[in-house]
Design a protein with these regions (language model features):
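Compositionally biased low-complexity segments at domain edges in trafficked proteins
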Residues: 102-122
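Beta-strand-dominated extracellular/periplasmic modules and repeats
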Residues: 2-96, 106
């Protein structure tokens, strides 16, 4: 079983703790028709991480060496379960891979009901 080449981590910055059970969807942009297609779906664990989006699949089988990808976090569902309102029902993060397909990419998301921040993690 190989390590997932793309991982994420969601932190609820208003509570100061990991955001568990956030549904996540990873998509790739097709260069042929400029449409996104789903590569994987998952859910953050109790530590707010989704380390196994593409586990068991070789990065070369799943990802191209270069390309545009989209990770969608279904934040409205997360906040609704907690009885909290949010301005952002989904957070979509588009990112571009420019390195070899065996590199690791980590997408952290710092989340609150009315703002979010992301960056290229390690």
């Amino acid at each position: 079983m190989s390590k997932s080449p793309i991982t994420c981590h969601v932190l609820d910055s208003t509570l100061g703790k990991p955001a568990a059970n956030v549904r996540v969807q990873l998509e790739a942009l097709s260069p042929l028709n400029s449409q996104f297609h789903i590569l994987a779906t998952g859910e953050t664990n109790s530590d707010g991480r989704c380390p196994d989006l593409l586990v068991g699949q070789s990065p070369k089988d799943v990802l191209v060496a270069k390309g545009v990808f989209k990770m969608t976090f279904f934040t409205g569902e997360y906040f609704a379960k907690a009885g909290r309102a949010t301005f952002y029902p989904q957070v979509e993060i588009l990112f571009q891979l420019t390195e070899t397909p065996d590199a690791h990419y980590h997408i952290p998301l710092l989340l609150s009901p009315f703002s979010y921040t992301t960056y290229r993690g390690s």
